[in-house]
Design a protein with these regions (language model features):
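Short beta-strand/loop motif that positions the catalytic acidic residue
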Residues: 71, 78-80
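Acidic catalytic loop of the alpha/beta-hydrolase fold
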Residues: 83-87, 121-122
Length: 140
């Protein structure tokens, strides 16, 4: 079983991968950031979208990349858009760094692929091909 999604579907995919041993690989497009960056107003967004995803009390102990990292050492692909207004690159890069540290500590850094593509908040044909290639490589 693999989990894949874009936007809120991506959020669900990495959450499911982190919490279920049945999921053997995961792909998430346009949903990874650190909470501190997502909930700030300094990026000029009218709506920062993070409050809907804040699990009460959990942020005291774990941030989004910490939760996603519970999936290590599973093969996981994260794709972000460099012009995605919902997920500022500062937070994406910070989250990716945290996750790479965990996969590295698990001896499986090669199982984590993180990308920042020239795109907005979308799952385009290039992303879909990357997902299919990643899953073909990791779950066949």
């Amino acid at each position: 079983i693999a989990a894949a999604g874009c936007s809120m579907g991506a959020y669900r995919a990495w959450m499911l991968s982190a919490l279920s041993d049945k999921v053997k690989a995961m792909c998430a497009v346009c949903w990874m950031v650190t909470t501190d960056v997502q909930l700030t107003t300094r990026y000029g967004r009218k709506e920062n979208g993070g409050f809907a995803n804040c699990i009460p009390g959990l942020r005291l102990f774990l941030d989004y990349p910490d939760i996603a990292s519970l999936a290590a050492p599973k093969p996981s692909l994260f794709i972000a858009g460099d012009s995605d207004k919902l997920f500022p690159l500062d937070g994406v890069r910070k989250a990716y760094s945290i996750m790479h540290s965990v996969w590295k500590d698990a001896g499986s850094e090669s199982n984590l692929e993180t990308r920042i593509e020239a795109q907005p908040h979308e799952c385009n044909i290039k992303n879909q091909k990357a997902i299919l290639d990643f899953l073909d490589k990791n779950i066949k």
